[in-house]
Amino acid sequence: MKKKINNIILKIDKFFYRKFKSDKSTKVLENIKEAKKIFSYINVPGEEDKIKFVGGCVRKAMTGEFIDDIDLATSFEPKDIKLKLSNKDIKIIDTGIEHGTITAILNKKKFEITSLRSDISTDGRHANVQFTSDWNKDATRRDFTINAIYSDIQGRVFDPFNGKSDLLDGKIVFIGSAEERIQEDY
C-alpha cells in the first residue's frame, strides 16, 4: 500500500509543479469546433445538457494549459450516443462499451465519450457499473475532486466537490476514502 501511495504522490508532484494561471476559464472549450459539433448532435434544444466536458480537459482549461485529450460525459447510454452520431462525419470506436465508453473521431480529433455511471460492485480496477442520468452519482465514483469538474459547451461549470478551488490551491483531495480509491486504481 505504501508503494502505491508513493507512486500516486510522484504523479501528483509532477502535475502540481506546473505554474497555474487561475485567470483562465472553461470558456475556451467552446472554441473546439469538433466538440461543438458533437455537442450539437447530442444535446436536445431547450432541454438540460446531456453531454459535458469532464476531467483533464476542464482542469487544463482552468489552468491555461494546452488541451490535448478530451473526455466527455453524457447522460445517454452508449447505444443512444452511437445512434445519435451515426450517419454523421464521425468515426465511432467501441473503446470500452461494457463500461460505457466509446471514442468519437472527428477531423482526426479523438473524444472519449462515457455514459454517466454508478458502481454496483468493484474489484480493484474492475467495476460492474450501472448507467445513470445522475451527474452527482457519476462524480462520486471519480478519484479526485479535480477530476469531478464538468463543463458544458458554454463554459458553465458543474463542480459538486469544489474541485476548482482544490485545483487553484494546489491540493489533491480524494472523493471518499483515499485508501479505497487507491485500491480501485491498482
Where are these regions (language model features)?
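Catalytic cores of the polymerase beta-like nucleotidyltransferase superfamily
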Residues: M1-Y186
